[in-house]
């Protein structure tokens, strides 16, 4: 029994993480590359379907959006840094964003019970995509 307790206590806590992805520039290609990048970092990555949505708060073409659920023992700040690096690697930049061109936007919506990006939770497509992930 003591051996089992020791073994259990050495396991790192896996955090339940919900990630949103969006793109309105070369969207199919950028979403595919973002999916691949997330799968390389998180072997258990599961994705919702991809929805086309009208832009909210910016002028520009429609977006492709989806959600991704992963588990990791990494702290929140490391996950955020990783996703921001993915954005840059996939061609996103502040200059392009100012022109309404979003190559890829990768945001952490939830880290365990902590909700981030409160306005994103109000977007009508989020519940639809969440339902996809809960049906798995």
What label would you give each PLM region?
Residues 1-12:
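N-terminal amphipathic/basic-hydrophobic helices that include classical n-h-c signal peptides
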Residues 21-23, 68-74, 110-113:
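Short beta-strand-to-loop capping motifs
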Residues 28-30, 74-81:
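Short, conserved charged micro-motifs
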């Amino acid at each position: 029994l003591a051996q089992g307790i020791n073994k259990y206590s050495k396991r790192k806590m896996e955090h339940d993480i919900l990630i949103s992805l969006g793109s309105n520039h070369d969207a199919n290609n950028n979403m595919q590359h973002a999916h691949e990048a997330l799968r390389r970092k998180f072997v258990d990555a599961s994705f919702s379907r991809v929805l086309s949505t009208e832009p909210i708060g910016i002028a520009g073409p429609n977006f492709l959006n989806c959600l991704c659920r992963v588990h990791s023992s990494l702290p929140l700040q490391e996950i955020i840094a990783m996703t921001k690096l993915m954005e840059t690697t996939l061609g996103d930049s502040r200059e392009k964003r100012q022109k309404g061109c979003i190559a890829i936007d990768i945001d952490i919506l939830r880290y365990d019970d902590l909700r981030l990006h409160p306005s994103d939770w109000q977007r009508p497509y989020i519940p639809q995509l969440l339902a996809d992930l809960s049906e798995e």
